[in-house]
Amino acid sequence: MTSQSQNIVETPSRVRAHALGINAPELAQYQDEPAQMRSGAVGKSGYLKLRFAKREHRSILAEMERRVPSMVQKALYWDEEMPELPCVTMISTSGCILQGDRLATDVIVEAGACAHVTTQSATKVHMMNANYASQIQNFTVEEGGYLEFMPDPLIPHRNSRFITDTTINIHPTATAIYSEVLMSGRKYHHADERFGFDVYSSRVAAHVFLGKEQPAGKELFVEKYVLEPKSESLDAIGVMQSFDAFGNVILLTPKQHHERILARVPAHFDIKGGIASGATRLPNDCGLVFKALGIDSAGVKNEIRQFWKIAREEILGVTLPEKFLWR
């Protein structure tokens, strides 16, 4: 057994990343291996572990483990509204997601700690002629913890296939904001790029955190959607209609915050302005879900930022810092 194989076997999330998609019906016809480099080979089996812990005056990135192509910058404290908040930017040394990639991420926020995790830019899923790419994301937020996971959009290129599975284990007193933005593709690059991908499969689930080394507790909710635009048009009313960007935000937080947040987030539909958004409750009183549609990423990101701002203000009593010009 190679050192890479040994490391994969010893890391449950990496094992899941390599297995994810093998038995997925939506990927049944994409099990062929790439001619260049086999799936999950060295450089194609990325792993990132981030563990945040509370110290006297602030939280810190206490542990970081990575395997190429995944890496992160050091924790920075650029949020002037929350100077105790470590902000970490995830980076891919390959610059994109390629066919045969198997990626896994573990983020742990210990009791009383806080963290903000983002990406340096949009994530591109490149064109594929064999196999697919898979991603496992595990988030654990312990008692009184606070996590913001706010990556930039994901852009699936023509003929790409991508499957992602996200699990959030959260203590009843903790808060987690999980965001994702999906684009229709590189619609200005080529006529066949808009909804030109083969498969985009996403599953997000949450469980009650029972403690370290303990199995996951009660399942709070599961959301899964499989997009196959070449089989069924996404331009239908009730799906994407004329929109090109989809934003999905999961807010898991104690019940006492829900009503105040919802009162400040009315449904918004402006077909001329190219934006639609709204929020509702998740099952088991575990939190809220916010969704937005737009003609471009800027509009959707603005809607998400407003929801994020309201959530922060109602939960923590602090707002967001001024938006960076380059973001």
Curated annotation (Swiss-Prot):
Name the GO cellular-component terms: cytoplasm
Principal subcellular localization: cytoplasm
List, in alphabetical order, the Gene Ontology terms for molecular function in this entry: nickel cation binding
- Family annotation (Pfam families): UreD
Keywords of this entry: Chaperone, Cytoplasm, Nickel insertion
Per UniProt, subcellular location reads as: Cytoplasm
- Show the InterPro entries listed in the entry: UreD
Tell me if Chaperone is a UniProt keyword of this record: yes
Q: Superkingdom, according to UniProt?
A: Bacteria
Q: According to its UniProt record, which protein family does this protein belong to? A: Belongs to the UreD family.
State the function annotated in the UniProt record. Required for maturation of urease via the functional incorporation of the urease nickel metallocenter.
| PANTHER family in UniProt | UREASE ACCESSORY PROTEIN D
The record describes its quaternary structure and partners as:
UreD, UreF and UreG form a complex that acts as a GTP-hydrolysis-dependent molecular chaperone, activating the urease apoprotein by helping to assemble the nickel containing metallocenter of UreC. The UreE protein probably delivers the nickel.
Q: What protein is this chain from? A: Urease accessory protein UreD
Origin organism is Yersinia enterocolitica serotype O:8 / biotype 1B (strain NCTC 13174 / 8081)
Gene encoding the protein: ureD
